UniProtKB/Swiss-Prot annotation:
It catalyses: dCTP + H2O + H(+) = dUTP + NH4(+). DCTP binds at K107, S108, T109, Y110, A111, R112, T131, L132, E133, Q152, Y166, Q176. One of its GO terms (biological process) is dUMP biosynthetic process. This is dCTP deaminase. The gene is dcd.
């Protein structure tokens, strides 16, 4: 399994619609960078956010998650409360090939401010907008900028095609369109 270069990512985006919309160079001027990089793609966060609040619940239960645990906003910025988190989605829609797995890593600009991004791998043949988990590890409110870079996706291509893909097993987050809460 090898990490894929900018040439491969560009070709797959242009010929197979793997990333849409796709920026074939890194946009950096006056923004938190996004677009194609040497060995990855920096995705952007959309202007839709769900900010966690504990007003309605005393416990977080992934098997019985209450949508009322979030305040939904649409804005150019999201203020994540101290020691809390928000959910968001990517601007880009991804279609992952059957022989590819992705890993997401946070951007250093946010990490140096105590903001951590968590995204599980995009499995072979998964497609959709990415639901992003943004944690504020600081004791102060943290600002997230919509339509700017949030994290980097690294693409790994296997030397053989998987037996069962995410699409084959009818994964519960397949073709997600917006911010999707936990499902069982």
């Amino acid at each position: 399994m090898a990490i894929k270069s900018d040439r491969w990512i560009r070709r797959m985006a242009q010929e197979h619609d793997m990333i849409n919309p796709f920026y074939e160079k890194q946009m950096r001027q006056g923004v938190i960078s996004y677009g194609l990089s040497s060995y990855g793609y920096d995705l952007r966060v959309a202007d839709e956010f769900k900010i966690f609040t504990n007003v309605n619940n005393a416990i977080v239960d992934p098997k019985h998650f209450d949508e009322k645990s979030f305040v939904t906003i649409t804005s150019d910025v999201c203020i994540v409360p101290p020691n809390s988190f928000a959910l968001a989605r990517s601007v880009e829609y991804f279609k992952i090939p059957r022989d590819v797995l992705t890993i997401c890593v946070g951007k250093s600009t946010y990490a140096r401010c105590g903001i951590i991004v968590n995204v599980t791998p995009f499995e072979p043949e998964w497609e959709g907008y990415v639901t992003l988990e943004i944690s504020n590890t600081t004791p102060l409110p943290a600002k997230i900028y919509a339509n700017e870079g949030l994290c980097q996706i690294l693409f790994f291509q296997s030397d053989e095609v998987c037996e069962i893909s995410y699409k084959d097993k009818k994964g519960k987050y397949q073709s997600q369109k917006g911010i999707v809460l936990p499902k069982l």
